From Swiss-Prot:
This is SH2 domain-containing protein 4A. Residues 315-407 form the SH2 domain. GO terms for cellular component: cytoplasm; cytosol. The lineage of its organism: Eukaryota, Metazoa, Chordata, Craniata, Vertebrata. Interacts with ESR1. It comes from Mus musculus (Mouse). In the kidney, expressed only in the glomerulus. Expressed in T-cells, B-cells, macrophages and dendritic cells (at protein level). In adult, highest levels are found in muscle and lung with lower levels in kidney. PANTHER family: SH2 DOMAIN-CONTAINING PROTEIN 4A, T CELL-SPECIFIC ADAPTER PROTEIN TSAD.
Amino acid sequence: MLRQILSDMFIDPDLLAELSEEQKQILFYKMREEQIRRWKEREAAMERKESLPVKSRPKKENGKSVHWKLGADKQVWVWVMGEHHLDKPYDVLCDEILAEREHLRAAKDSELRKTQSLELANSLKIKSQNCDLQAMKKTEPQNVTRKAASEEASGQGPRAIPTRKDDKAQTKPVKEKDHEEMKQTEDEKTKQIYKSWKEDSEWQASLRKSKAADEKRRSLAKQAREDYKRLSQRGRSGDGLQNPLTGPQKPRRPPLPPKPQFLQPLGIPPKSLGNQGVIRTEISSAQMDTIRWFKEEQLPFRAGYQKNSDTIAPWFHGILTLKKANELLSTGVPGSFLIRVSEKIKGYALSYLSEEGCKHFLIDASANSYSFLGVDQLQHATLADLVEYHKEEPITSLGKELLLYPCGQQDKLPDYLELFQ
């Protein structure tokens, strides 16, 4: 099943929904490995193609070309953000970008206000100058005559007229003061806007969520790699396991087991399962295909049986929905589990009750062995071997899921009857 997913580079959304978070991360890790492998193959093919002699094309006049910068290893120089010790953290870069944006916005607003105020002042100044000129033209001859007459009568000479330099000397401190006030106002507004950005609760919440999500993804990916290595090492020396590096060895089919002894729910006496007029529900074509697959390919490998007897294991169930599996486990305690036949793949689904709730893991049985989807290092010969192994070894390192308490049948008739009749 895993090989099929990696070949198509696609997984059905319904199938993906049944995977646990750990299995999803491992599957994505394997798909990424497959992408890299295909990319390397294409690169090697391109290099072989480029090494062949090619007719040189005539160069165009003033032709433009791109040359990549090469590093010390003669490969294309690449800089990965965040790996160098001098690189700034992500949140610091965000703060600097926001501060720069607000500074530019405040400067632009200040420049606009300054331009508008200058235009207004110039227009008022021009109007006042026009009015003064008109008034001076009317009164200047009279004032000059009157002033000259008064000066001659008093015997004093004409007084010096104030020059334009004196006016500039008086207005210069005023302009400098206005400029300082405007600059101070601009700085205060920039600080205020930046502070409001920093204190914005939604922005802070989204930043925290993104950091937490990144940290969780890194942790899950790291844990998946560690599980990958740990299980591969254990798989080399485990009993009842197959090493995928040498390929799954197809076991010889044993003879068909005898008619199973069905486990009855507690408090209900055993009854003959002959022709009792059992009411059957309509079975879909997908269920019929699953039943046929189980009878033809799984019964010879004692799927659903206890390890050392001809009795159906208490943890084994038939074709159950996700909702029904959750209902059965809801009456149990953490550590309870069941294995049900899956309609999505040629395999099974292990439903497990943890402290946080129900978890579901897909078991691939397409290669005549049993392993969790995504973790293809440990391939068990039977379902019972898989259960026995994970009674002591947790399914995932993060969840520490140990198969402690099998969840049995709760109805009068077991839900796996159709698989064995």
